[in-house]
């Protein structure tokens, strides 16, 4: 993984993240980027722009 220094188990200089649904090419995806599409009665889950995690909103559409 080019975003992760295997020797230190930390992200490489200039990288924000190494993995996650909201991580793309070592950077956090923009706020509002759909990271988990709507399913059934649930709305899309979107990235915050501040984390590599895809938060579950748990809001009905």
UniProtKB/Swiss-Prot annotation:
<dbReference type="InterPro" id="IPR018358">
    <property type="entry name" value="Disintegrin_CS"/>
</dbReference>
<dbReference type="InterPro" id="IPR036436">
    <property type="entry name" value="Disintegrin_dom_sf"/>
</dbReference>
<comment type="similarity">
    <text>Belongs to the venom metalloproteinase (M12B) family. P-II subfamily. P-IIa sub-subfamily.</text>
</comment>
<keyword id="KW-1217">Cell adhesion impairing toxin</keyword>
<comment type="function">
    <text>Inhibits fibrinogen interaction with platelets. Acts by binding to alpha-IIb/beta-3 (ITGA2B/ITGB3) on the platelet surface and inhibits aggregation induced by ADP, thrombin, platelet-activating factor and collagen.</text>
</comment>
<keyword id="KW-1201">Platelet aggregation inhibiting toxin</keyword>
<feature type="disulfide bond">
    <location>
        <begin position="9"/>
        <end position="23"/>
    </location>
</feature>
<feature type="disulfide bond">
    <location>
        <begin position="35"/>
        <end position="54"/>
    </location>
</feature>
<dbReference type="InterPro" id="IPR001762">
    <property type="entry name" value="Disintegrin_dom"/>
</dbReference>
<dbReference type="Pfam" id="PF00200">
    <property type="entry name" value="Disintegrin"/>
</dbReference>
<feature type="disulfide bond">
    <location>
        <begin position="3"/>
        <end position="26"/>
    </location>
</feature>
<keyword id="KW-0800">Toxin</keyword>
<feature type="domain" description="Disintegrin">
    <location>
        <begin position="1"/>
        <end position="61"/>
    </location>
</feature>
<feature type="disulfide bond">
    <location>
        <begin position="17"/>
        <end position="23"/>
    </location>
</feature>
<dbReference type="GO" id="GO:0090729">
    <property type="term" value="F:toxin activity"/>
</dbReference>
<feature type="short sequence motif" description="Cell attachment site">
    <location>
        <begin position="39"/>
        <end position="41"/>
    </location>
</feature>
<dbReference type="GO" id="GO:0005576">
    <property type="term" value="C:extracellular region"/>
</dbReference>
<keyword id="KW-1199">Hemostasis impairing toxin</keyword>
<feature type="disulfide bond">
    <location>
        <begin position="22"/>
        <end position="47"/>
    </location>
</feature>
<keyword id="KW-1015">Disulfide bond</keyword>
<keyword id="KW-0964">Secreted</keyword>
<protein>
    <recommendedName>
        <fullName>Disintegrin atroxatin</fullName>
    </recommendedName>
</protein>
<comment type="subunit">
    <text>Monomer (disintegrin).</text>
</comment>
<dbReference type="GO" id="GO:0005886">
    <property type="term" value="C:plasma membrane"/>
</dbReference>
